[in-house]
């Protein structure tokens, strides 16, 4: 069974990484799909985010990382995944993610969305929050993989 885990991952957090590891155990093959959203200016270019994720998952054998543009259901179909993984931190995430899941189902009835609650150790994490803490010099080593921490510190030193 193959599951698609889509997101912008700008940057990858330990919460994302935890979901990837748990999904590998539950579903086998996991495709991490990094969205290139041309309407937003990301902190890290797509190529850097792909490197960050590949570095963080190098110890995992059933994970692949790709980039995509457009509809997530089209990406899932392209990689032959009939499941889409979404992480839930709070009830507010559920309301938003459920709308997206219903939209995806209306576009492709063969694809199901699976929700996994985040590990309580990471339930407060978001990429936006991590960037905010890093911007003001706060400690983020418990929030992101080591390489992402280095990249964020370097980014905010320059900007």
From Swiss-Prot:
It holds the Pfam family CTP_transf_like. Its cofactor is Mg(2+). It is found in: Cytoplasm. SUPFAM superfamilies: Nucleotidylyl transferase. The keyword Cell membrane does not apply. GO terms for biological process: coenzyme A biosynthetic process. The record marks 16 as: Transition state stabilizer. Gene3D superfamilies: HUPs. One of its GO terms (molecular function) is pantetheine-phosphate adenylyltransferase activity. ATP binds at residues 8-9, 16, 87-89, 97, 122-128. Pathway: Cofactor biosynthesis; coenzyme A biosynthesis; CoA from (R)-pantothenate: step 4/5. Substrate binds at residues 8, 40, 72, 86. GO terms for cellular component: cytoplasm. Its EC number is 2.7.7.3. Its main location: cytoplasm. It comes from the Bacteria. InterPro entries: Cyt_trans-like, PPAT, Rossmann-like_a/b/a_fold. Keywords: ATP-binding, Coenzyme A biosynthesis, Cytoplasm, Magnesium, Nucleotide-binding, Nucleotidyltransferase, Transferase. It catalyses: (R)-4'-phosphopantetheine + ATP + H(+) = 3'-dephospho-CoA + diphosphate. HAMAP family: PPAT_bact. Reversibly transfers an adenylyl group from ATP to 4'-phosphopantetheine, yielding dephospho-CoA (dPCoA) and pyrophosphate. Belongs to the bacterial CoaD family. Homohexamer. This is Phosphopantetheine adenylyltransferase. It comes from Prochlorococcus marinus (strain MIT 9515). The gene is coaD.
């Amino acid at each position: 069974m193959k599951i698609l885990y889509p997101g912008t991952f700008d940057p990858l957090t330990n919460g994302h990484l935890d979901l990837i590891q748990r999904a590998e155990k539950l579903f086998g093959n996991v495709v991490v799909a990094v969205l290139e959203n041309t309407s937003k200016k990301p902190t890290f270019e797509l190529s850097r985010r792909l490197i960050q994720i590949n570095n963080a998952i190098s110890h995992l054998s059933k994970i692949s990382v790709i980039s995509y543009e457009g509809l997530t259901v089209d990406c899932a179909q392209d990689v032959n995944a009939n499941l889409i993984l979404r992480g839930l931190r709070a009830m507010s995430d559920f309301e938003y993610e459920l709308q997206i899941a219903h939209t995806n189902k209306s576009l492709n009835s063969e694809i199901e969305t699976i929700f996994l609650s985040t590990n309580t150790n990471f339930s407060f994490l978001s990429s936006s929050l991590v960037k905010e803490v890093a911007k003001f010099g706060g400690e983020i080593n418990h929030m992101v993989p080591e390489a992402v921490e280095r990249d964020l510190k370097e980014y905010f030193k320059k900007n």
